[in-house]
């Protein structure tokens, strides 16, 4: 009996770091998938049906399985398609990759986006506090090609989709050079390495379009 053909669909949004990181993993592993672009202000009935709880992207549909939340989707992809592993095999290194991923999506996103834009304590204070957090990642990637070592891994996908290809576009749009090379030589080297990875290049949002979008979001938050 012939094996049932696999079906992989990803509901995403071009500017979402959360769906872009899932695309990176699928491309890296060579998994054929159908990409369905969502218009987030006008969510499709399919998105509302598949993710009625959060009504957000990404949503991965693998045959009859529906998966939500980018970190969990990345782990599912890694365990389902074994080639080109993205999570460390060592239990401690795996736990630390998860720790830093949560640090990025919780602390750096919160401080480097909404808190910075609102700047209730002053913009310069918010900038320095954000840089203090980024310095932890600077130290973590020192001496490595990628956070994952010699090859791109789970943490590179989380950090890459969020920092250089999302938040940095916001910072650029509001006139902040958040990661100057003289302060963050290792992070800047890592970003250059990341941009050379084929699976990543195809998932980087258009720069000027992203800057324009992030700047508009910042203006909305600031005036709220």
UniProtKB/Swiss-Prot annotation:
Residues 90-217 form the GST C-terminal domain. InterPro entries: Glutathione-S-Trfase_C-like, Glutathione-S-Trfase_C_sf, Glutathione_S-Trfase, Glutathione_S-Trfase_N, GST_C, GST_C_Tau, Omega/Tau-like, Thioredoxin-like_sf. Gene3D superfamilies: 1.20.1050.10, Glutaredoxin. Glutathione binds at residues 16-17, 42-43, 56-57, 69-70. The modification Phosphothreonine is found at residue 151. Belongs to the GST superfamily. Tau family. This is Glutathione S-transferase U1. It comes from Arabidopsis thaliana.
